[in-house]
Swiss-Prot record:
This is Nucleoid-associated protein FMG_0513. It comes from Finegoldia magna (strain ATCC 29328 / DSM 20472 / WAL 2508). SUPFAM superfamilies: YbaB-like. Binds to DNA and alters its conformation. May be involved in regulation of gene expression, nucleoid organization and DNA protection. Residues 15-26 have a biased composition (Low complexity).
Length: 113
């Protein structure tokens, strides 16, 4: 009876391929994350009277408020509309990130990305 395993442990070639695939996936995720960080999304409320722009790092880049809203003097309504637009912008960023990174991971949630 000869040695069936010739040159090492069975399955180790597959392990090497898996490691290469994981490294490739990590590179793709890092590239995608960098691209996402540079992407901006816009959300509005009040029929476009409030506009919020956020980037892929979940940072608010700008907020524009129609002057007529300020003239009305309804601060509470203005605050609510800003909050709605900010929350919508953040949700858009999260959805965009989840969608793009999900294409790489096949839907597996990987912490830190």
């Amino acid at each position: 009876m000869g040695n069936k395993f010739r040159g090492g442990m069975p399955g180790m070639g597959n392990m090497g391929n898996m490691m290469k695939q994981m490294q490739k996936m990590q590179r793709q995720m890092e590239e995608t994350q960098k691209r996402l960080e540079e992407t901006e999304v816009t959300a509005t409320s009040g029929g476009g009277a409030i506009e919020v722009v956020a980037n892929g790092k979940k940072e608010i880049v700008s907020i524009k408020i129609d002057e007529d809203l300020v003239k009305d003097g309804d601060v509470e309504m203005l605050q609510d509309m800003v909050m709605v637009a900010v929350n919508d912008a953040i949700k858009k960023v999260l959805d965009m990130s989840e969608s793009e990174l999900g294409k790489i991971t096949g839907g597996i949630n990987i912490p830190g990305f």
